[in-house]
């Protein structure tokens, strides 16, 4: 089986349907004896340029190992689902399991924010004990 990276963008008004869509698409891949190596829901993000007069979309990234028939079925589902405004399926040489750069940056920002909050809490406690 081959490895694929799949990104699809969902209409922002249909964001509440994304978990069901992810479940349906991952179910189709696993039913065809495929495996999902990475699944990231990037959420609603700004588009680089308007698509169908939309400026935002809900992004989902999947890295899978699946037979060609499962990928063909997935592309057909993307094509006939009106909520999916764009999709891209790329074949990759190896399975990608590490977090994407977007998720890594998000985690780093969260860690920095938590560290800063802990430092300010420690500083305020130290200031209270001096009085």
Curated annotation (Swiss-Prot):
Pfam families noted in UniProt: Ribosomal_S6
Classification via PROSITE patterns: RIBOSOMAL_S6
Ranges of Basic and acidic residues composition bias in the record: 104-116
Entry keyword set: Ribonucleoprotein, Ribosomal protein, RNA-binding, rRNA-binding
Annotated Gene Ontology cellular component terms: cytosolic small ribosomal subunit
Domain of life of the source: Bacteria
GO BP annotations, alphabetical order: translation
Residues covered by region (Disordered): 98-131
Gene3D superfamilies referenced in this protein's UniProt entry, alphabetically: 3.30.70.60
Biased composition (Acidic residues): 120-131
MF annotations from Gene Ontology: small ribosomal subunit rRNA binding; structural constituent of ribosome
PANTHER family with a match to the protein in the record: MITOCHONDRIAL 28S RIBOSOMAL PROTEIN S6 (PTHR21011), SMALL RIBOSOMAL SUBUNIT PROTEIN BS6M (PTHR21011:SF1)
Family: Belongs to the bacterial ribosomal protein bS6 family.
Job of this protein: Binds together with bS18 to 16S ribosomal RNA.
Protein known as: Small ribosomal subunit protein bS6
Source organism (scientific name): Klebsiella pneumoniae subsp. pneumoniae (strain ATCC 700721 / MGH 78578)
